[in-house]
């Protein structure tokens, strides 16, 4: 699959305030916090990413109210930057759920009291206890290529995202979920992709409603994923971005959203000044842990770092990365790095697994290994992203 990118350039005025927003100042911040209990598994992360995009390729067709219109949501950093979640409040009175914020999908679903097999540690939303809940009558079901799945019913309710109150948001209440979801530290998923890939067609995403209900006046959200070496955590800012979190100016990149994703073109890859790949397409996906590359690109990168193929989508790599040059991608008119300290994803004794791997596609998935080193502002209304190295 190849993306056909928008040919016209999108030009945005860059402002210098610490927290940037539209003139009316409406935005919401969601901070990220840290969870040290999660353990990484590179093979599972690769399989999850492959299964996720296999599914979409097969498809046709705080509780207080924010007054300034800025949504700030902190997110928790699972063990060593593996995955991140933010807290969202649903219902009246509200129940706080830990959700995986995912730019690679578009559904808002979570464990509910109707679920017959949801994880015992998951917080479960009870529609019978919310005065603002309304039944929808439709059902939903998600099946992934690795055999995992979830299903349930649709409804609507009030959703508070970083202090901004979304009315009549469509929610997906899980009645059943596979064991892969039961054992995770999150209660569900909040999709930040485009509405063309919602499981039930015609459903408005939370970002759609933030814009249409006038809760944010600047149709963007800024993503900062903290690194464990800097204390972990991170934040999502809906309606703006935090210019203190990145260095220099933002580079504007056109997006191809024809498949419902934030698709960009990577012009090339280099290591230590030597070019190791030509151009390829990539998806910016906060819901994927690793940097998943096309097979040929991954092989060239692995060779440059002396990594060996494990033939399961992962590479074994030296645990001592002190002599490694950064992995550099040319995107638009700028270059963006994955530094040496991010090239190791998983360590087990003296053996290490690389933060990059490969899938079965001719495009890349730029997951958290890339995103925790580069600040990204997503604009779904005039589809483009803006990227800058983290400060």
UniProtKB/Swiss-Prot annotation:
SUPFAM superfamilies in the cross-refs: Acid proteases
PANTHER family linked: ASPARTYL PROTEINASE (PTHR47966:SF1), BETA-SITE APP-CLEAVING ENZYME, ISOFORM A-RELATED (PTHR47966)
Upper taxonomic lineage: Eukaryota, Fungi, Fungi incertae sedis, Mucoromycota, Mucoromycotina
Species in which this protein is naturally found: Rhizopus niveus
Family: Belongs to the peptidase A1 family.
One Gene Ontology molecular-function label: aspartic-type endopeptidase activity
Protein's recorded name: Rhizopuspepsin-3
Active site: 102, 285
Propeptide: 22-68
Catalytic activity from the UniProt record: Hydrolysis of proteins with broad specificity similar to that of pepsin A, preferring hydrophobic residues at P1 and P1'. Clots milk and activates trypsinogen. Does not cleave 4-Gln-|-His-5, but does cleave 10-His-|-Leu-11 and 12-Val-|-Glu-13 in B chain of insulin
């Amino acid at each position: 699959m190849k993306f056909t990118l928008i040919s016209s350039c999108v030009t945005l005025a860059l402002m210098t305030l610490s927290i940037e927003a539209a003139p009316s100042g409406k935005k919401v911040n969601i901070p990220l916090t840290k969870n040290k209990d999660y353990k990484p598994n590179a093979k599972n992360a690769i399989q999850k990413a492959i299964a996720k995009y296999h599914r979409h390729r097969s498809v046709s067709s705080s509780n207080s109210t924010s007054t300034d219109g800025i949504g700030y949501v902190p997110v928790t950093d699972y063990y060593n930057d593996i995955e991140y979640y933010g807290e969202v409040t649903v219902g009246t009175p509200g129940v706080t759920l830990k959700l995986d914020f995912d730019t690679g999908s578009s559904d808002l679903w979570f464990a509910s009291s109707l679920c017959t097999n949801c994880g015992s540690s998951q917080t479960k939303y009870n529609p019978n206890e919310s005065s603002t809940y309304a039944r929808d009558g439709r059902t939903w079901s998600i099946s992934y290529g690795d055999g995992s799945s979830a299903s349930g019913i649709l409804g609507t309710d009030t959703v508070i995202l970083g202090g901004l109150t979304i009315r009549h948001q469509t929610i997906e209440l899980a009645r059943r979920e596979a064991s892969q979801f039961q054992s995770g530290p999150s209660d569900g998923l909040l999709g930040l992709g485009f509405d063309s890939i919602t499981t039930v067609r015609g459903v408005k995403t939370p970002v759609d409603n933030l814009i249409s209900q006038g809760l944010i006046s600047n149709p963007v959200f800024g993503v900062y994923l903290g690194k464990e070496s800097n204390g972990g955590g991170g934040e999502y800012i809906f309606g703006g971005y935090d210019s203190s979190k990145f260095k220099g100016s933002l580079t504007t990149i056109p997006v191809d959203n024809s498949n419902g994703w934030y698709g960009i073109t990577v012009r090339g890859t280099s290591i230590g000044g030597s070019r190791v790949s030509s151009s390829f397409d990539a998806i910016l996906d906060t819901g994927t842990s690793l940097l998943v590359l096309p097979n040929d690109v991954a092989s060239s990168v692995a060779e440059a770092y002396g990594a060996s193929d494990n033939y399961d989508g992962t590479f074994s790599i030296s645990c001592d990365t002190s002599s490694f040059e950064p992995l550099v991608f040319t995107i638009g008119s700028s270059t963006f790095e994955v530094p040496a300290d991010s090239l190791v994803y998983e360590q087990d004794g003296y053996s290490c697994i690389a933060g990059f791997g490969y899938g079965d596609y001719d495009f890349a998935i730029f997951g958290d290994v890339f995103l925790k080193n580069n600040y990204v502002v997503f604009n779904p209304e005039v589809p483009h992203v803006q990227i800058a190295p983290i400060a």
